[in-house]
């Protein structure tokens, strides 16, 4: 299945000059959604994954079903102030300013084999923040998996030492 055909592209959203990749169309079509998760599972089945980490919000959409299919736990990474227990945090840079992500301090145990799952790799800034938190807790990142990669933004280069996978690539 060509997943690129299943992704709706919206020009000028959320602002002029942006070509937004809308993954809700994959979620709506049961065959495409199943194919996406099954493809990721096939890539990861021999990695002995303990935990899948998904960044807010679209990382939840692919990370949770992936964790279930792998028989692994799922850890959500949220924006600051959204998690109820003791957290660790990491700041990351945006085009104009910065933001902060958090995860529960007890969500990753030392030595656990971790996969990060998200919808899109652009510059890699968000994922670097997630990596920082996982590694500070002693987790071993065995793979980072994306549905979409915007290759021109060179996020993969920022994540160079990790095993990176993307199912669909766009040159922007």
Curated annotation (Swiss-Prot):
It catalyses: AMP + diphosphate = 5-phospho-alpha-D-ribose 1-diphosphate + adenine. The keyword Ubl conjugation does not apply. Its main location: cytoplasm. It is found in: Cytoplasm. Keywords: Cytoplasm, Glycosyltransferase, Purine salvage, Transferase. Its EC number is 2.4.2.7. It comes from the Bacteria. Pfam families: Pribosyltran (PF00156). GO terms for molecular function: adenine binding; adenine phosphoribosyltransferase activity; AMP binding. InterPro entries: Ade_phspho_trans, PRibTrfase_dom, PRTase-like, UPRTase/APRTase. Catalyzes a salvage reaction resulting in the formation of AMP, that is energically less costly than de novo synthesis. Belongs to the purine/pyrimidine phosphoribosyltransferase family. This is Adenine phosphoribosyltransferase. It comes from Clostridium tetani (strain Massachusetts / E88). The gene is apt.
């Amino acid at each position: 299945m060509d997943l690129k055909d299943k992704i709706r592209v919206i020009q000028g959203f959320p602002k002029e000059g942006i070509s937004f990749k809308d993954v809700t169309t994959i979620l709506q079509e049961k065959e495409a959604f199943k194919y996406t998760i099954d493809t990721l599972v096939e890539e990861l089945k021999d990695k002995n994954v303990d935990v899948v980490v998904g960044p807010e919000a679209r990382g939840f959409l692919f990370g949770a079903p992936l964790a279930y299919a792998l028989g692994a736990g799922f850890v959500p990474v949220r924006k600051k102030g959204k998690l109820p227990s003791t957290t660790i945090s990491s700041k990351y840079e945006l085009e104009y300013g910065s933001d902060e992500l958090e995860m529960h301090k007890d969500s990753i145990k030392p030595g656990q084999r971790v996969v990060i799952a998200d919808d899109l790799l652009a510059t890699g800034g968000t994922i670097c923040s997630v990596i920082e938190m996982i590694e500070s807790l002693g987790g071993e990142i065995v793979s980072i998996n994306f549905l979409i990669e915007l290759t021109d933004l060179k996020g993969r280069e920022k994540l160079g030492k990790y095993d990176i996978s993307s199912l669909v690539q766009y040159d922007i």
